[in-house]
Amino acid sequence: MVLDQTKKLLIVIIGALLNAAGLNLFLIPADVYASGFTGVAQLLSSVVDQYAPFYISTGTLLFLLNIPVGILGWLKVGKSFTVYSILSVALTTLFMGILPETSLSHDILLNAVFGGVISAVGIGLTLKYGASTGGLDIVAMVLAKWKDKPVGTYFFILNGIIILTAGLLQGWEKALYTLVTLYVTTRVIDAIHTRHMKLTAMIVTKKADEIKEAIYGKMVRGITTVPAKGAFTNEQKEMMIIVITRYELYDLEKIVKEVDPKAFTNIVQTTGIFGFFRKD
């Protein structure tokens, strides 16, 4: 348990460092915006810098924006998930204060692509190990509890506002480069983790009862079991079908590996659910 928590903490630190590096060394110096709350923080920092007699850094604004979201997550999502998410935001803010805002390239396209890739690697790793970078991920969790509709619309609306505002503030060329960054970020996160809110896991195993008990001890999810037989070995097994959110994927993978390392698990995207799906 201590080893797992230490590993998770280390991943959160590395993810925050990569996210901060992508912002300070590539995106912010080039006036190219990230997605989600980070992009909102960049926009607010630009507006304050242009129209106010004082300056507030992107990192500070990112932390302030996540305070109400963190409180919401604590009440509606779960304490462990929220603590790691806020820790990720705090570390990102810290690293953004330490790393200099200096451009490694004068080519805006290179900044947009590499900034998006480096930040996305940090975000993807954080998600893969059961945490998040706060902001929209916590909002998405809350929305997923209220309704089973895809939350991609909310991501699209907020990122669309970021692109339009970037165009008004910095010119439409910068807005197009921001669009490149958003595309690259999404593709890299997809490659490392997944952007799908709900997933279906099909687990073929000889230890269905043990896995079932372990799953029920960690999460509240319904499981359907179907008799299965290996075509080559003719061995009798069971296939367990369970629908989870993407934030539970890390816990599920960990359970299956611990109980039955020889189990075969297939994870597929779930586009819709009809019937009861527990949201608590």
From Swiss-Prot:
Pfam family, one: DUF2179
Top-level taxon of the source organism: Bacteria
GO cellular component, one term: plasma membrane
Keyword vocabulary terms for this entry: Cell membrane, Membrane, Transmembrane, Transmembrane helix
Membrane-spanning segments: 9-29, 54-74, 80-100, 151-171
UniProt topology in membrane: Multi-pass membrane protein
Location of the protein in the cell: Cell membrane
CDD domains associated with the record: YitT_C
InterPro entries documented for this protein: DUF2179, N-reg_PII/ATP_PRibTrfase_C, UPF0750_membrane, YitT
Xref: PANTHER family: UPF0750 MEMBRANE PROTEIN YITT, UPF0750 MEMBRANE PROTEIN YITT-RELATED
Family: Belongs to the UPF0750 family.
Entry protein name: UPF0750 membrane protein YitT
